[in-house]
Amino acid sequence: MQALNTTSLTLSDNRLLILDQQALPQEKQWRSCDSVEELVDHILTLRVRGAPLIGLSASLLLALLAERGVPRKELEQALITLRASRPTAVNLMNNLDRMKLALAQPQWVPAMVEEAQRLVEEDRKLCDRIADHGAGLVKPGSRLLTHCNTGGLATAGIGTAIGVLLRAHQQGKVQQVWVDETRPLLQGGRLTAWELGELGIPYRLICDSMAASLMAQGQVDAVWVGADRIAANGDVANKIGTYSLAVLAHYHRIPFYVAAPHTTHDPHCPNGAAIAIEQRAAVEVTGVTGSFGSCQWAPVDAPVYNPAFDVTPAALISGWVFDSGVITPQQVSEGIFQRALG
């Protein structure tokens, strides 16, 4: 396969390396990804994360395995194993569906390689288009709030919501970005803060519970988030805490935008209630672990509820920003999400 370099994925000498997002920002560690078992472990431990990136890493690994001569039957099983690794994010399912079609071709090895490379290039272009459409919604002097991480760390390109912030910043329209730390795994505090710093975008880090106070003071002009799955009625599954921000923004009459590629839309999912929500380990809530070490702050036997995602109802969303353009609440009420986009 051709060499590849993105913020979080490197392909060189027929080896796939992933940037360990659990080690950031203290350390920049590249980890090998030579087998399906390794990739599943990276996904489950969130070394690889972000809906688009998970799908791309799976596609690239499958193509590499095909080139190495792994039998077709084993690749078919690999598709099943990878599909089960992260149930909420639909990008993974969409990418695996396309790789499955490539595997069914008579010349399946080159077909899988070409499809994986096509998916990477498509994602880069999708990010650029999302940024262009979204930046048009950002007013000069804006103070924007974002949640979790939606930049180059989560995609092959400049990102989704962070891509919008970057494009608006390049246009001189961003005064400051408020970054939610995003408990319990701190993707905002660890990853988004790091990315914005690298990009030169002015930001301030806040605890999740501080967002309401900022909105009440008139310090937030709009909220920008990504998505892991968008249902046929416009409901959005995204990182836990997104729904809270949407409720707060609605109460304070602040625009709430979702930025995502069309591959995140799932017309076969009727509404948010039908989206499977991943439940994660209690240890993520009772303490914290990273390259800096581990710390347990709650009682060891404390009962914990730890969903990785929540669902934001379509009624709370001001606009869905896709690579194809901005979709309005009126269009959603008319059923635009009930058919495939793109």
UniProtKB/Swiss-Prot annotation:
Annotated active site: D228 (proton donor)
* Site (Transition state stabilizer): residue numbering on this chain: C148
What sort of enzyme, by top EC class, is this? isomerase
- Pathway named in the protein's UniProt entry: Amino-acid biosynthesis; L-methionine biosynthesis via salvage pathway; L-methionine from S-methyl-5-thio-alpha-D-ribose 1-phosphate: step 1/6
Q: What are its E.C. numbers?
A: 5.3.1.23
Q: Which residues bind substrate?
A: R49, G50, A51, R86, Q187, N238, K239
Annotated Gene Ontology MF terms? Answer: S-methyl-5-thioribose-1-phosphate isomerase activity
What are the protein's UniProt keywords?
Amino-acid biosynthesis, Isomerase, Methionine biosynthesis
Per its record, the protein catalyses: 5-(methylsulfanyl)-alpha-D-ribose 1-phosphate = 5-(methylsulfanyl)-D-ribulose 1-phosphate
Taxonomy, superkingdom: Bacteria
Q: Which InterPro entries match?
A: IF-2B-related, IF-M1Pi, IF_2B-like_C, Initiation_fac_2B_a/b/d, M1Pi_N, NagB/RpiA_transferase-like
| One of the protein's GO biological processes | L-methionine salvage from methylthioadenosine
Family per similarity comment: Belongs to the eIF-2B alpha/beta/delta subunits family. MtnA subfamily.
Any idea what this protein is called?
Methylthioribose-1-phosphate isomerase
Q: Which organism is it from?
A: Serratia proteamaculans (strain 568)
